[in-house]
Amino acid sequence: MYAIIESGGKQYKVAEGSVIKVEKLDVAAGEKLTLDQVLFFNDGNGNVKIGNPLVAGVRVIAEVMEQGKHKKITVFKYKRRKNYRKKQGHRQPYTKIKVEKIEA
């Protein structure tokens, strides 16, 4: 059984027990979370539900494991011959969640 959900403008394939990192959500660690933006659902027995754009009656229950930041990336802007250099760093925040069950 798996589902494809949308969170933070991105799509994720999730199954029961899977751990994923999504864009930062305003939820504390340890709290339960209901994701009802389900785009696709497959129960494993050949029954498939495709949303238009969302599947009605299907939701994903997850627990927030932690809030964190990804590794730092360097953003470097440069203009030749003009002595213009700009160096910045960026760490994108994320929320790590564990899918507990998919309710259909």
From Swiss-Prot:
GO terms for biological process: translation. One of its GO terms (cellular component) is ribosome. Keywords: Ribonucleoprotein, Ribosomal protein, RNA-binding, rRNA-binding. It comes from the Bacteria. GO terms for molecular function: rRNA binding; structural constituent of ribosome. Pfam families: Ribosomal_L21p. Part of the 50S ribosomal subunit. Contacts protein L20. Belongs to the bacterial ribosomal protein bL21 family. This protein binds to 23S rRNA in the presence of protein L20. This is Large ribosomal subunit protein bL21. It comes from Syntrophomonas wolfei subsp. wolfei (strain DSM 2245B / Goettingen).
